[in-house]
Amino acid sequence: MDDRASGMTEPEDAAGAGGQLRERAAGAAFSRRAVLRGAAATAAVGAASVTAVASASAREAGSAAYEDRPAYAAAPHDENRSLRVMTFNLRYASDTRPNSWAERRPVMRKLLRREAPHVIGTQEGLYGQLRDIAADLGPHYDWVGTGRAGGSKDEFAAVFYDARRLAPVEYDHFWLSDTPYAIGSRTWGNTVIRMATWVRFRDIEYSQDHQDHQTQREFFLLNTHLDHAVQYARERSAELIKERLAELDPALPRVVTGDFNVAAHKNPVYDAMTGGGRLVDSWDAADGRSAQYATFHGYRPLVPDGDRIDWILTSPSVRTRYASINTYSVDGQFPSDHLPVQASIAW
């Protein structure tokens, strides 16, 4: 979902964001405090602590807290060391109460620490908010991203990862428009800038188990946030994402995370993303799964068997051992207006 879709105001897009700067980077792992050249602003840590104030309106909603164990705990033990993936629309940081970032941040911290995902595709995060999350996750996490209006401006499609398990090999950003490498571009009728970030990861743990270095386990993760209002823009965005995925090394599996702003199985965008046999919905393909809820709740009571607009898609060669929609809250306070979606995958 997008901010305007829930009746809230989104941060104003920065002016002059349509420059023609294009950024590509490859090679070595990135420094934790590296500042990406050009448009990118990535890996940063450190943030002020805040005091949580529980949201009375959320408590009144009567939404049940997630069961008293991490979602990944339900995944069966496997010898292949499954990768824990999460997609999470963070709800951009604001001071508006209830559900301000100051109220939500402590719950977000607890959720992420207990789940300990290896990689997280996030949506809507603002630069300072992402720095808060990086600090809360701890020094063994890093992240890649850039603001959709360029640099640190506006919302990010940032990708966090556990650097003890994963090492980035290369990454890039592109904008969902006819000019995908023009920063801040939007040409399909949408008023909000939309973009995608992808990263090629190496599984460090797997590589360490194969000391001959002849076998490396790598994969691509692409993270995005489609438009909340314009169906044409969503459909064109889906086609562009498929084109970009097809340009990547065909030998490596793909994982796609995002807020697609349409319900799974109910929209041509879903058909476009999963058609042709190149991507499958991890929720449908999972060996086991949690109860289903609408992944956007807007701080209202949860909807059992509701629409899934936040997805984790994978190459067919990837096995999803367990998929879950995480309803974790503390005293009625949710960390976001979306529920995180999680998958334990292996290949």
What are these regions (language model features)?
Residues 82-95, 170-174, 216-227:
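Active-site-proximal beta-strand elements of phosphoester/diester hydrolases
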Residues 84-90, 108-133, 160, 199, ...:
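Active-site beta-strand/loop signature of hydrolases that rely on acidic residues for catalysis
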Residues 2-13, 18-28, 32-33, 37, ...:
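Metal-dependent phosphoester-hydrolase catalytic domains
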Residues 87-104, 177-190, 227:
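Acidic/histidine-rich helix-loop elements
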Residues 2-45, 49-136, 149-155:
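N-terminal, active-site-proximal structural segment of metallo-dependent hydrolase catalytic domains
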Residues 90-93, 125-129, 148-151, 165-166, ...:
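Solvent-exposed loop/turn segments at secondary-structure junctions
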Residues 81, 154-156, 193-197, 217-222, ...:
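Residues that flank catalytic or metal-binding motifs in active/ligand-binding sites
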Residues 66-77, 119, 123-218:
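Structured beta-strand-rich core segments of catalytic domains in phosphoester-bond hydrolases
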